[in-house]
Structure formats: C-alpha cells, structure tokens
C-alpha cells in the first residue's frame, strides 16, 4: 500500500494519498504494526477489522466503511495485477454509505453567532471559525474545501463563480453585503494571496525543503485549517450553548432548514426533499433560474 501511496503522490493526487495514508495507519494500529500477506486477507480478517473500528477505535459506520472501501480498492488492484487470488474478503463487511441524520441549528443561533465578536471573549481562532461557519451559511452551505479554495478571480461583477469539488457542478452566487463585510475583514491577511480567505495562507510551519511541491504544501495547509476550524467550532458551540456538535456541515443544513422555514420552494433548495442522489438534486437546480436562487438566498440572509 505504501507503493500505491507513493504513486498517488507522484501523480499529484495528494488528497487521495492522505486518505490512503489514514487508512493504512488505521489498519496498522489494528494489526499492532504486524505485516500481513495479501493471501491472508480474508473475510474473517476484515470482519475482525470492522469490529475493531466500531468497538476499539469507536468510529462511526461511515468512517469504517470509508476505510474498508479504500482497502478493498487496494486489494482489487493487487488482484488485477495477479499478486493474489480473489477471495472476496469484503463481502461480509459494510462498505456502503449510511444516510446520516441532517443536523441544523435554529436561525436564532445563526443570528447569535453573527452578533458575537471579540468583546464576547472569543479568541482569534474561535472568531475565524465563527466567520467560516457564517460564510458557509451565506454561500448556501458551501463546503469547507470549496470555501478555502475560493480565489479572488472567482469573484467578478458582483457574482461568485466556482465549481463544487464534490460534483464538479458550476455554481454562481450573487455577492451580498454580508459576504463582502466578511471578506474585507481578512483582506490584510490575503493581500499577497490569490485566495479570498486566509485558510491557505502560510502558517509558519512550511518545510525547510525548498523543493517541496507547491500543491502538496497547499494540501497540508488545507488539512491543518480544516482541523483547526473544526476544533474551534466545537469549542465555540459549547461556549454559547448550542446543543449538539457544531460543524461546518451544520451550516449547510441550517441554510436549507431556514429556507424551508421561510416558505422557499423545495426545488430551490439543494437539499431537495431527501433525494438520494446528487443527480436528482442537479436536475432540480438546473431547471431553476439563477436569479430565483439568488433572491432566495438574499431572503434568508435578511432574517438574520
């Protein structure tokens, strides 16, 4: 698996390589760093690993499924290369994606977060986490990976244009006053950066190796920022008394819930009545005039 990770890095697939590395590290912890031959990977071994993930590592079913899918992909590559016979070791473990309960907070909580400032004993890192949450909400539930990688060139003539990394769908969002105010707040930090927000600005921990790949460094900065934002959002949620775990994903569902509560048409919302596929959602979104979606977003921001 180390060879596969090295190949992914060589091909510039840094994010994917990190997923494979995380899976390998998890499997090594399960094995106490003991090697295992490909021919020894069978259904019993995978059932045992799945049990370890649930009961010892205490990860959720989607996380265990994520690790098992990566192991399965690695195993199938080895089978395709004739390195081991196919024994179907993953036939008895869960490798699907469980539908998770949609998490949202009331509009009052979003308004409460908007009114918070450093006077309310927010640390600078908590304030940035709060701002990331608000910007995700303002931008119709944009994911952190897309938010962090927004470039100044994505903003043109009063509209933000970007491609959603998960689906490759092209989105256009009218730039509202709330968005502009948050962006201007960080302009000093992004003055020499191509990005709108400072999540990928050098954190001072850059490797001394001058030959390090720029894309690899960007991936490192992104994952550090993601972990930092997640940690301080949880702290912020506890500090202001928000029930449940506060994450950026909550911002996405809170936007949809607020939209539904303001009688905005279901077809306008990306959540789209619990559809099971992105394809169905895209069909709905593609049939709507972008101005209708922009008006809906402006209506939502006005209630804060």
Residue ranges and their predicted role:
Residues 76-83, 136-157:
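Short, charged phosphate-coordinating catalytic segments
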Residues 153-159, 243-244, 264-283:
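Short, polar N-cap/turn motifs at the start of nucleic acid-interacting alpha helices
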Residues 92-144:
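Basic, Lys/Arg- and aromatic-enriched nucleic-acid-binding interface segment
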Residues 104, 164-168, 273-298:
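Catalytic-site neighborhood detector that most strongly recognizes the C-terminal catalytic loop/helix
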Residues 149-185, 201-202:
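Conserved tyrosine-mediated DNA breakage-rejoining catalytic core shared by Y-recombinases
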Residues 3-15, 24-101, 116-120:
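N-terminal core-binding DNA-recognition domain of tyrosine recombinases/integrases
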Residues 121-124, 221-222, 230-271:
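Short, basic (Lys/Arg/His-rich) helix/loop patches that form interaction surfaces
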Residues 110, 176-243:
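Active-site/catalytic core of tyrosine-dependent DNA strand-transfer enzymes
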């Amino acid at each position: 698996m180390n060879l596969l990770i090295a190949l992914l890095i060589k091909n510039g697939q840094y994010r994917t390589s990190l997923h494979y590395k995380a899976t390998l590290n998890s499997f090594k912890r399960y094995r106490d760093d003991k090697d295992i031959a490909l021919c020894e990977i069978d259904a019993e071994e995978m059932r045992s690993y799945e049990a370890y993930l649930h009961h010892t590592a205490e990860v959720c079913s989607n996380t265990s499924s994520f690790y098992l899918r990566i192991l399965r992909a690695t195993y199938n590559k080895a089978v395709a290369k004739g390195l081991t016979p196919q024994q179907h070791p993953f036939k008895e473990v869960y490798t699907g994606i469980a539908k998770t309960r949609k998490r949202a907070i009331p509009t009052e909580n979003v308004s409460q977060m908007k009114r918070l400032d450093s006077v309310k004993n927010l640390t600078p890192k908590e304030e940035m986490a709060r701002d990331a949450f608000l910007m995700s909400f303002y931008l119709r539930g944009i994911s952190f990976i897309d938010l962090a990688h927004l470039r100044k060139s994505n903003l043109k003539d009063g509209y933000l244009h970007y491609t959603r990394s998960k689906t490759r769908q092209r989105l256009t969002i009218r730039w509202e006053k709330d968005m502009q105010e948050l962006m201007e707040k960080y302009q000093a930090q992004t003055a020499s950066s191509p990005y709108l927000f400072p999540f990928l600005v050098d954190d001072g921990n850059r490797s001394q190796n001058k030959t390090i790949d720029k894309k690899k460094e960007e991936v490192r900065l992104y994952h550090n920022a993601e972990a930092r934002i997640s940690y301080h959002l949880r702290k912020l949620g506890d500090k202001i008394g928000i029930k449940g775990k506060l994450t950026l994903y909550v911002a996405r569902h809170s936007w949809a819930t607020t939209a539904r509560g303001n009688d905005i048409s279901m077809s306008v919302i990306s959540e789209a009545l619990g559809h099971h596929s992105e394809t169905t959602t895209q069909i709905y979104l593609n049939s709507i005039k972008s101005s209708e979606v922009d008006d809906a977003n402006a209506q939502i921001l006005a209630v804060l």
